[in-house]
Amino acid sequence: MKKFARFIGIDDGYFVRNVHKKTKLIGAITKHTILDGVLSREITIDGDDVSEKIIDMIKNSNHYYQIRGIILYGITFAGFNIADVELIYKNLGLPIIIVMERPPKDIFYKAIEKYKPNGIELIKKAGPIYKTKTPFGYTYYQVYGIDKDTASNIINNLAIVSKIPEPARVAHMIARGVTKGDSSKPRAGGDSNPGPAG
């Protein structure tokens, strides 16, 4: 895959459970390190609409035919709104990489089993969790529609200032900035999940 190919990173905005019903879903399109476009939708807290919103957001964008892959910042969004990578790939035909700062803990899976009956099945669709070493530490990742070695190369090519690839890092900053007023605020708080980034 070309070094300057366009990728879209996707992350969700800040929310407080039992206060907010929806939050922003942000897609940041980068051409290597250059921000080339921003897409947005709203998703339901603990809902089931993130996959259809990702599909709609990308498919109806002028950038669709230029994008070479999707990088999700975690597989869960807006609480327990879990991305269905099989459905996304089937509709868009784009390889998917899910990146995490750390592997999920047992409490994450227990929470999924408790609050989202089909959640574990959706997570399993993304396959095993791998790790790749970047100049900033290990990045953990899952893949769909692409092999793990190619995904590792993409992550390292786009890990410019942190172990999170630039499209996902920028999407995270924009999402937090527009929903919380400050992109530098940490994930911990009302919008955090008991597991990997998402």
From Swiss-Prot:
Signal peptide: none annotated. Gene3D superfamilies: archaeoglobus fulgidus dsm 4304 superfamily. Residues 179-198 are annotated as: Disordered. Pfam families: DUF99. It comes from the Archaea. Belongs to the UPF0215 family. This is UPF0215 protein NEQ431. The lineage of its organism: Archaea, Nanobdellota, Candidatus Nanoarchaeia, Nanoarchaeales, Nanoarchaeaceae.
